[in-house]
């Protein structure tokens, strides 16, 4: 492990969207193995403590990134039934840490990765409560509406700005976005592309003052991840409208990130798709019950193994390809 504890500057990556963008992997966290923190990987704080039982922190402090980031929705209490230490194996598992770990070999040794977590499970453009926003705490826990002036949007912009303002040397890599599932189910799904495009345009305008920290490109990249097979099979028309917009967007630098071939299954929290791996001490989602699972619809979310593997792999490939071409 690299001995540097405090990087001189950070590559900033904002992670936003709904549940599949965040820690909804239901398998057992392995904080001493696959999910180990790294001294050069940090996040912007949101909660009162860095982790359950950990030291206190304040909103937008730079703190270590773990497997369960400080998103708008707090997943730190959704413990796996076989977790033996709720101060280390707490909550659920996301992909942000694994994206950051896989980016480290491609950045200078004196730099780090700073993740800006801004996700909310169940959030949408066409449904959901707006919640509230405050400069001291960001978006409220019940904020579930995306747009150009909603609390979730204010949270997204203000925290990204805060990360860049920490150090003028910090560089913005872009936004990793996974969202659309909740809108798939609404009657207004066809308006999602317009709402999303307007939000991206607003975000880019609101980051103009940090132009030099975006390598002087005008349009900050958005890396838009795909969803699970469940949504594709059950909502094919609305899927084509929403995710088709990610794939063929009229705006510049909207990059679609896919994880599976058409018609392929697997990669979800469904117990038969998330097996144990006793060689690593990993126990999958089958042990969870209504008291501690994220939802009864298990195939609606990507698994812990998928987040550690193909999801973070594909995001990193897309990020590296984008910036190499510049």
UniProtKB/Swiss-Prot annotation:
Q: What is its EC number?
A: 3.1.1.-
Q: Which InterPro entries match?
A: Carb_Esterase_6, SASA, SGNH_hydro_sf
EC class (word): hydrolase
GO MF terms held by the record: sialate O-acetylesterase activity
Q: Which domain of life is it from?
A: Bacteria
Q: Where in the cell is it found?
A: Periplasm
Specify the protein name. Probable 9-O-acetyl-N-acetylneuraminic acid deacetylase
**Natural source organism:** Escherichia coli (strain K12)
